[in-house]
Amino acid sequence: MSENIVSVNNLSVSFDYQENFLSKKQKIKAVNNINIKIKKGSFFGLVGESGSGKTTLGRAILGANKISTGNVIFHDEERDFDLTTITPKEKKEYRKKAQLIFQDPYAALSPRMTVRDIIAEPLEVMKITKSREETDARVRDIASKCRLNLEHLRRFPHAFSGGQRQRISIARALVSNPKFIVADESVAALDVSIQADILNLLKQLQHELNLTYLFISHDLSVVAHVCDIVAVMYLGHIVEMAPSRELFRNPRHPYTKALLSSIPSIDPEKKSEAIELKGEIPVQ
């Protein structure tokens, strides 16, 4: 049995680009020749500036973006799923095992549905439960794990704060009992005072439910707080990957050093200047 839950091998994702309707279509590589292994039970961080390809990579691993070259293998306890050759029937099974936590808790929840119906929807769509009683029991169980009260299940999303809405989003992602979670900027839209609460909840759920995370973020201080291993993306490439403490203590790539230099310090005596990257942007 593999110790990895996800293996990404020589993965590239391209999109068609056309300046105007008269110009010729071109291919732009959003993700270029990525190789990573995500170990079971790990909190794997993926960082980089906007446009570096983080979200595209995460969506490709979930099967939401079409893979141009390479492959993604999801190692389940019973079998492996190859996302380049996966059938529609297998994809339905895979979606029970790999889920996404969205960035914006305000846009991710339907204002016309109660919290109970929002959390229960994956169970009904995937036909995981066989009766309303079983569905309600599953919803109540995961809601309590995500620190939601039973009275919350009867309310609509507008009645909740940003942190509470994100807990609802987390409960919806976990109700199908997945083993792998892609958290795409899952605390970026929240106040700093709420971020720590959500991050601690994710860590707690990781231990309780034996979860593996791919945590996508541009906030290095957040990644340092929760991640075991960190990969740095730049222009669709992984430029550096190392255990979290090692990467923050001894960065090797110039881009990683530039990212770390941009983190503000709370020490008024410490003076640090952001490193400016020089030269031309590499051609992909």
Regions found by a protein language model. Name each.
Residues 2-4, 17-22, 27, 244-284:
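Short catalytic/signature loops enriched in Gly
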Residues 156-160, 164:
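Conserved ABC ATPase signature
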Residues 22, 71-93, 131:
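ABC ATPase NBD Q-loop/coupling interface
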Residues 78, 124, 133-151:
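Conserved ABC ATPase "signature" region
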Residues 186, 190, 194-272:
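P-loop NTP-binding/switch modules centered on Walker-like glycine-rich loops
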Residues 47-49:
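The feature captures the beta-strand-to-loop junction immediately N-terminal to the Walker
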Residues 175-179:
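A short, proline-enriched helix->beta-strand linker immediately N-terminal to the Walker B motif
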